[in-house]
Amino acid sequence: MIKDIISSVNPYLEKKMLITLSMGFVSGVPLLLTITLLQAWLTDEGVSKSTIGLFALVGLPYSLKFLWAPIFDHITLSKLGRRRSWLIVTQILLIITIVSLGMANPSMNAMNVAILATLVAFSSASQDIVIDAYRRESLTDEEQTIGASSYVLGYRIGALAAGAGGLILADYLSYQMVYVFMSSVMFYGLFITFIAEEPKHNNQPSSFVAAVYNPFIEFFNRHVSLSIPVLILLFILLYKI
């Protein structure tokens, strides 16, 4: 029995699965910084409930990320490879935007906070795009299930750390310091990106049509009823708002 347990756990302890787990973790942190922790901060600063309600729109980049996702398929920034180079860019952007958000003053300028929170969400959504592509290309078809489980576990841990962990820290530190502390998590993300290997099967689409239009049409052609793909797309668009 013990051997069976060990054999079932071993795949999760492989290097690429631990990297997938870590990428899930750094992907889960920014989301709660713009939702749970930000709402608590706004409430403590006396921002009106109607204004706080409008901050739900900050999550729109997560739903609209398909608009700029093709950029990450067509442009390679450095010799590190297409996926890792974009991961570094998005993680540096997250560090800058999270720190900037923490330095803002909600009671003095809520609009400035909203803009910075949207930039955090944009950087986070962009990181999610690249991580999803990296995971799909670096794992074999047989490893996708374990990889997805590892990613979701890491994502939940990251979200818990940013949400519950951030609120606990806010009892002892200022919100500014909490955001600065949370931004340091992205340095762990940079470390993971540097030790990760660029996917070997990394074929770049020949054109925008091949990358976006053809897969989109093929997705609709799979289903007899138009309502099924429409419902799937609506779920993808709305589930993080």
Task: Report residues per predicted region.
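Cytoplasmic helix-loop-helix junction between adjacent transmembrane helices
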Residues: 119-154
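Transmembrane alpha-helix termini and helix-breaking/packing motifs in multi-pass membrane transporters
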Residues: 70-75, 102-103, 160-180
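Symmetry-related core transmembrane helices of the 12-TM Major Facilitator Superfamily/SLC fold
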Residues: 89-96, 176-195
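Flexible cytoplasmic inter-helical loops of multi-pass small-molecule transporters
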Residues: 195-217
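Cytoplasmic membrane-interface "Motif A"-like loop-to-helix N-cap segments
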Residues: 74-91
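Glycine-rich segments within core transmembrane alpha-helices of 12-TM secondary carriers
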Residues: 61-66, 143-170
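Helix-loop boundary and gating motifs at the non-cytosolic
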Residues: 2-62, 228-235, 239-241
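C-terminal ends and interior cores of transmembrane alpha-helices
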Residues: 87-108
